[in-house]
From Swiss-Prot:
InterPro entries named among the record's database cross-references: KdpA
The protein, known as: Potassium-transporting ATPase potassium-binding subunit
Claim: Ribonucleoprotein is one of the keywords in the record: no
Location in the cell: Cell membrane
GO cellular component: plasma membrane
GO molecular function: P-type potassium transmembrane transporter activity; potassium ion binding
Coiled coil: none
The organism of origin for this protein: Bacillus cereus (strain ZK / E33L)
PANTHER family membership: POTASSIUM-TRANSPORTING ATPASE A CHAIN, POTASSIUM-TRANSPORTING ATPASE POTASSIUM-BINDING SUBUNIT
Assembly information from the UniProt record: The system is composed of three essential subunits: KdpA, KdpB and KdpC.
Domain of life: Bacteria
HAMAP family cross-referenced by the UniProt entry: KdpA
Length: 555
């Protein structure tokens, strides 16, 4: 029965992807019906904020994005620092320590939601609502706006205006869908209140303080925006965030909704729907491979316990919630790292070595399907690399969407693809070379190495999940992961926007018999191969020293 539920969940991922992709294309390309509904409200916002409707260059678009995001980081930083003297603080929580406030503000603006604090004890209701929830809307709206400009550039059209795209992302996508999802979560038993904690009497007569808050609205945008940060420190393992299997499936659907829809949006906007389908199917195959790998490993259980003759028919249940089970915990772990959300319904630090390898690889590749917007930018980056390699092998100038891929584009892409592993491996080496980093490791040996690399991989990929055995709430970890999150977020977005702007200016080359098509199964295979080979070449040595070595040791 559990496998039937898994298949149904997978089918739901597939069934909602195309309709959502069509809606996104209409939402950002000026559908008359949507303009009638949302247009008056949006024009009022533009009038109040002084936004003028004009097309920006890629530099203007990128500058607008960085300045607005930077302003939000500063505002929210001071909210965290001053929350102790601000209203909506029934628990009288003190202001955040400076480096933790720095890390948290960047974390949520970068759509990472890495949490070096426990949500219910570290933030007031004001900080949760005005600081955290506000950024949970603003961060994915930023990247969804940018990916629309990116696709327009690939299609040879004007990039548009960042502030208009940002507003449309909020009014037409995130606010309405999150509102409806929050109502469903309330129906499933997720609390939504501004009242303080409830004191309850336990069976043995002791008193217990039960924390609550505006959880349903928080969880809705947490999953829809691929944010991932928990209202509670236990994240989606907490019964108030994720009461049962229905809420669990809805959370996974929300995580996958926009990342899986964007290939279809892309296909419609560039005038090649088949290419969008090829990208979707290719990535879904990689996703399935990851799910099968982690599930098989978790169901086989801990090799060390197997060697002792201990039977555990449910697989490795350490760190998992009984109400979700091993299979759905594995699916959730695959979804949350494939969609770069970072929410967890099981503790990733307790996964088997090969089970923990799958989330790690998903974040290292950062393309299957990746987070809202940012992931799709990486997908096209790998697609262009696949085209470039194919062109070199047959001695032709590579072409993508009828545009020649030349030195300028490949230099930008080369720098971008190297920057991600440089952040991960460089900062991991720094942490391992100083006691400021190694003192936080709770496990010696191979697992300890994986803890460190996982933290920086999660930060660079803007995922936010962690091997929570790491004691990361220290100035060293707060500052270094904050820098990795900021650089990992904005560097690739800006460089790939420059690539799209460069391609926009090029004339379309007429298609000939020798043109390498990017809308067939051959390209899909080369595309998958490029992702796997580039990822393996870059990160394989670390994976051998970490989870693979741990697995062989346990065997």
């Amino acid at each position: 029965m559990i496998w039937v539920a898994v298949v149904i969940t997978m089918l739901l991922f597939i069934l909602v992807a195309k309709p959502t992709g069509i809606y996104l294309e209409k939402a950002f390309q000026g559908s008359k019906k949507l303009d009638k509904v949302f247009g008056p409200f949006e024009k009022l916002i533009f009038k109040i904020t002084g936004v003028k409707e004009y097309n920006q260059t890629w530099k203007q678009y990128a500058l607008s994005l960085v300045l607005l995001n930077g302003f939000m980081i500063v505002v929210v930083y001071f909210i965290f620092r001053l929350q102790g003297v601000l209203p909506l603080n029934p628990a009288h929580i003190e202001g955040m320590e400076p480096t933790l406030a720095f890390n948290t503000a960047i974390s949520f603006m970068a759509d990472t939601n890495l949490q070096h604090y426990s949500g219910e004890n570290g933030l007031s209701y004001l900080s949760q609502l005005i600081g955290i929830t506000f950024l949970m809307f603003a961060a994915p709206a930023t990247t969804l706006a940018l990916v629309m400009a990116f696709i327009r550039g690939l299609a040879g059209k004007e990039l548009g205006n960042f502030f208009i795209d940002f507003t449309r992302a909020l009014t037409r996508v995130f606010l309405p869908i999150a509102f409806m999802a929050a109502l469903v979560f309330v129906a499933f038993g997720v609390p939504q209140t501004l009242d303080g904690a409830v004191t309850a009497q336990t069976i043995d007569g002791a008193k217990q303080s039960i924390l609550r808050g505006p959880v349903a609205s928080f969880v809705a945008i947490k999953e829809l925006g691929n944010n991932g940060g928990g209202f509670f420190g236990a994240n989606s393992t907490h019964p108030f965030e994720n009461p049962g299997q229905m809420s669990n499936i809805l959370q996974m659907m929300l995580m996958m909704l926009l990342p899986t829809a964007l290939p279809f949006t892309y296909g419609r906007m560039v005038g090649n729907k088949k290419q969008g389908r090829i990208l979707f199917v290719s990535l879904f195959m990689v996703f399935l491979l990851g799910f099968i790998t982690i599930t098989t490993s978790e169901l086989n259980g801990n090799p060390a316990l197997n060697g002792m003759g201990i039977e555990h028919v449910q697989g490795s249940t350490e760190g998992k919630e009984v109400r979700f089970g091993t299979v759905f915990s594995s699916l959730y772990a695959t979804v949350t790292t494939a969609a770069e959300t970072g929410a967890v319904n099981t503790m990733h630090d307790t996964l088997t070595p090969i089970g923990g390898l799958v989330p790690l690889v998903n974040m290292m590749l950062n393309t299957v399907y990746g987070g809202v917007g940012a992931g799709f930018v990486n997908i096209i980056m790998y697609a262009i690399i696949a085209v470039f390699i194919s062109g070199l092998m047959v001695g032709r100038t590579p072409e993508f969407l009828g545009k020649k891929i030349e030195g300028k584009e490949m230099k930008l892409i080369a720098v971008t693809i190297l920057f991600h592993p440089l952040l991960i491996l460089g900062f991991s080496a720094l942490a391992l070379s100083t006691s400021l980093g190694t003192d936080a490791i709770s496990h010696s040996g191979f697992h300890g190495l994986t803890q460190v690399v996982y933290e920086y991989t999660s930060s660079a990929a803007n995922n936010g999940s962690g091997f929570e055995g790491l004691g990361d709430n220290t100035p060293f970890w707060n500052i270094t992961t904050g820098l990795v999150m900021f650089l990992g977020r904005y560097f690739s977005l800006i460089t790939m926007l420059a690539v799209a702007a460069s391609l926009k200016e090029k004339t379309v080359v007429p298609e000939t018999v020798g043109t390498f098509r990017t809308d067939n199964s051959l390209f899909g295979g080369i595309f998958i191969g490029t992702i796997v080979i580039v990822g393996a070449l870059t990160f394989f040595p670390m994976l051998v020293l970490g989870p693979i070595a741990e697995f062989l040791t346990l065997k």
